[in-house]
Amino acid sequence: HERYLFEQIKEAYYAKDRQTQMLLIPLLIGLSTKEMNIVRENIDMFENAGFILEEFGDNTYKVSGVSNVGYNIDHKSMFKDMITELSTTEKTERQEKEHRFLATLACKAAVKGGMKLDVEEQKRLVDNMIGLDNPFTCPHGRPTAIPMTRYEIERKFMRK
């Protein structure tokens, strides 16, 4: 799911097709001076990803809209994680910085282990993955599937 979301987010980001979900109650997120500067320096990345932000006092951002990806997301935590990712890529080339920023957004919005999906959601997830150019790794490089031989499968199900 993370890989599929990443490809969708990346396509919308570079097409400047902002996918924003307005929040009924805006988030007020307190930040350190360093974090405030990171957001200021990268405000275009947040906006292109669908966030609607404005400074709200000395060390606070008001978030009125968020990237419209995933569900059951803690937007405050996601926002802070994206700032943390940007803080580790300060001297990185713009394209790599954007890749890591979008990968973090996809990671935070993706279905996680232990989440329950109904049959339709499971089918849609598999169909979406099959249609990708690179369905075999998440944007961070971790595998999305593990190949197994017939023998390994039979052994797991105690047939051998």
Protein language model regions, located:
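Long, charged low-complexity intrinsically disordered regions
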Residues: 1-160
